[in-house]
Amino acid sequence: MFCIQCEQTLEAPKKKGCAYATGMCGKTAEISDLQDVLVYILQGVSYWADLAHKFDIIDDEINHWAPRAFFATLTNVNFDRERILALANLAENYKTRLKQAVIAATTLAQQPLPTLPTVAEFTLPNTIDAILTLAPQVAVNRGYETINEDVIGLRLLCLYGLKGAAAYMEHARVLGQTNNAIYAQYHHIMSWLGTDPTDLNALLECSMEIGLMNYKVMEMLDLGETNTFGHPLPSQVNVKPIQGKCILVSGHDLHDLEKILQQTEGKHINVYTNGEMLPAHSYPELKKYPHLVGNYGSAWQNQQLEFANFPGAIVMTSNCLINPNVGKYADRIFTRSIVAWPGVAHIEGDDFSQVIDCALALDGFQHTEIEHMITIGFGRNALMNAAPAVIDQVKQGNINHFFLVGGCDGAKEERSYFTDFAAQVPQDSLILTLACGKYRFNKNNFGDINGIPRLLDVGQCNDAYSAIQLALALANEFDCSINELPLTLVLSWFEQKAIVILLTLFALGVKGIYTGPTAPAFLTDNLLAIIAEKFDMRSISTPEADLNTILSA
């Protein structure tokens, strides 16, 4: 086992990364190795898809499936051996299908096949023992014994960034947004990474290409969400329980939430969101359901306590899932899509009757607590509508700085930095927030500036796209670059979606970003120095020191 893709990975003085029987996320060495094999086969699929594209062969089924399968290897998604093996076997079949199509095309065109890299000729063994024996040869850090560690680090930066983009591609696909040019670019990058490149400059350029590609993917996802559910509206959400039977929906998939709301109409079941599903309450086509009653709980790392205390059925639509056996709720949590845990019921298709039956059989909340309302819903359209008023307050001198404070949350104590930072932001400043990092402070009262809330909840992690649109609008109004705005980004990272958003910001030329709580372990000191020099990325220190530096610039 070797895994170093998330923020909680082991970091010893002489060795970084999870490399023992179980990773910090809870996945076993076997699952980790199987995921490495799956990634390698997917790189082979992409090699043949990339080659097929040169002959105008486009296989929509494979294009739509490949990023989805890659998403299954993202942190806290799929822990189920049989499901990962099934994905690997299907990848092998798809690779063969593409290969046969390419061979037929080259024969027809009387052209020879190019010299094939190892990744293109890799064949999945027939037995689990043989697959696991082979796993170290295709590990994500393969060649580390002889290859410069900076090369390995940049390969991983690209691989993990592309994995985050693949997750957003799958979210967009679910909402009907596909783009063959994006799929072609994805396959080209994935294929190239499978050839184990060693050129540092080429790898840095690749990371920027991934960032720009992801910007387009986030635009697709924004379009899918707003076309399907309407533009988010500033909305009040109750974060306290209401008496009655209940279902909790976590993850990111608004499509699943809509299906659950439709199927629970008239059944006297209250539906709650959790984690990154909080923004659902601001979409007109979702908030119209009266039994979507509120948000329960906080960020993913608290679920083993919060889910244990939730007296109803739970649906996990995407990341982040952690061991449900710890809180003894494995018998009432259901996984969806590429999410899986051994022994946990998995919902195929759009029939949630199992979930509904489970909720009806459970006690539900016995009492209604005093409501506590928070404000959300400042997506792209709402931000653009508010922009004239914001600009006017800036010109009057009432708003002097903008902070984007958010990102992925996690369990480390150092993450209290983000709570303290938000609390210490000056009263003449606005705070934009997004992703589950917002739970560090989103229940606090930040007041307003002449009617403009000081805390603006932009949405899910992918709604960084909305924040970028506001920054571009402000830069246009004040005839300056984004980096010349009184705008500071303070981002917490945990997994691969955060990595690709960071790459997107870098690729768009955004500099001076503060990140934490720690630097990605897969980046060497040399690479961190290069990134700091090129993009002025800064590690967080203390809220007081960082605010002093920011506001005195």
Curated annotation (Swiss-Prot):
Pfam families in UniProt: Prismane
UniProt keyword Metal-binding present: yes
Annotated localization: Cytoplasm
Cofactor binding remark: Binds 1 [2Fe-2S] cluster. Binds 1 hybrid [4Fe-2O-2S] cluster.
A single cellular component GO annotation: cytoplasm
Signal peptide: none
Residues bound to hybrid [4Fe-2O-2S] cluster: 252, 276, 320, 408, 436, 461, 495, 497
Binding site for [2Fe-2S] cluster: 3, 6, 18, 25
Keywords from the named record: 2Fe-2S, Cytoplasm, Iron, Iron-sulfur, Metal-binding, Oxidoreductase
Cofactor section: [2Fe-2S] cluster; hybrid [4Fe-2O-2S] cluster
Reactions mediated catalytically: A + NH4(+) + H2O = hydroxylamine + AH2 + H(+)
A biological process from GO: response to hydrogen peroxide
Enzyme class: oxidoreductase
Modified residues (Cysteine persulfide): 408
Listed InterPro entries: HCP/CODH, Hydroxylam_reduct, Prismane-like_a/b-sand, Prismane-like_sf, Prismane_a-bundle
EC number from the UniProt entry: 1.7.99.1
UniProt-recorded Gene Ontology molecular function terms: 2 iron, 2 sulfur cluster binding; hydroxylamine reductase activity; metal ion binding; peroxidase activity
Similarity section: Belongs to the HCP family.
Job of this protein: Catalyzes the reduction of hydroxylamine to form NH(3) and H(2)O.
PANTHER family with a match to the protein in the record: HYDROXYLAMINE REDUCTASE
Listed name of the protein: Hydroxylamine reductase
Species: Photobacterium phosphoreum
Gene transcribed to yield this protein: hcp
